[in-house]
Design a protein with these regions (language model features):
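Short secondary-structure transition/capping motifs
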Residues: 12, 73-77, 107
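Basic, amphipathic juxtamembrane/active-site segments
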Residues: 87-127
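Active-site His/Glu-centered metal-binding helix of metallohydrolases
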Residues: 80-88, 101, 105-109, 137, ...
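Glycine-rich active-site/cofactor-binding loop and its immediate structural neighborhood
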Residues: 64-100
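Hydrophobic alpha-helical transmembrane segments
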Residues: 1-72, 113-231
């Protein structure tokens, strides 16, 4: 199973930037562990989801704008935590025995908190939960692939970094909407984009996995037959 986003570590261009490497080195020098950074990502997601939720009930445009700015900021801080925990663990050599759990579990909670928060904020909790469910399912298929001995499939079109880009962009665009009409069309569209995009991602990853499993089985069968003939 080869292609874009395949392997055992999510391909991120930001990992090779000077600022990220400098920040990771500083974090490594401190007593902060990768697990603590991963746990902090859930806090950032909770703050993002809470900001989205409260923005829908804000009494004035000014308060709503402030909450949307905070939501965008916390979405990006969630991604920053996701970047740094891996860098501190791998490049910093501070990986822990339970690291694989904390590398995955907080991400699932974070997606749920953010998208459920958006849904509640625009009075469409069902859509928010649908986006959250499909987001979690993308990771499930990826981990299912790894559990069956295949490389992790980080392909899109709606992988984690794409989902956070949509959420952040929607929060910022909603500032204009808040000042103009006070509606929530931008966030509604964003949830649909995440839900549908995540569903497509699930199908794409599932198709890759099934195809690879069949190819592997066929290869093993051919090798077995060839071995019998050689004997």
């Amino acid at each position: 199973m080869t292609g874009e986003g395949m392997g055992d570590r999510r391909p991120l261009a930001s990992r090779n930037t000077r600022w990220a490497q400098t920040l990771a080195r500083r974090m490594t020098a401190l007593s902060v562990t990768p697990n603590q950074i991963s746990q902090t990502s859930m806090l950032m997601a909770a703050l993002a989801g809470g900001s989205f939720w409260l923005s829908g009930a804000a009494g004035g445009a000014g308060i709503r704008v402030a909450l949307l700015i905070l939501a965008a900021l916390f979405c990006q801080l969630r991604l920053l935590c996701n970047l740094l925990d891996g860098m501190v663990a791998v490049e910093g050599g501070k990986g822990e025995a339970d690291g694989p759990f904390w590398n995955e579990f907080p991400d699932r909670i974070a997606d749920i908190l953010i998208f459920a928060g958006v849904g509640c904020g625009i009075a469409m909790p069902g859509l928010g939960w649908a986006a959250a469910a499909f987001a979690v399912l993308t990771a499930y298929v990826r981990e299912l692939g790894r559990a069956t001995g295949n490389p992790s499939d980080f392909g899109g079109p709606m992988a984690k970094q794409h989902r956070m880009a949509v959420a952040t962009g929607a929060a910022l665009l909603s500032i204009i909407e808040a000042l103009w009409s006070g509606g929530s069309w931008v966030l509604t569209a964003a949830l649909w984009i995440v839900a549908v995009g995540s569903a497509v991602t699930v199908l794409r990853r599932a198709g890759n996995l099934v195809g690879h499993l069949k190819t592997t089985a066929s290869t093993r069968k051919s090798e077995s037959i060839s071995g019998k003939h050689d004997a």
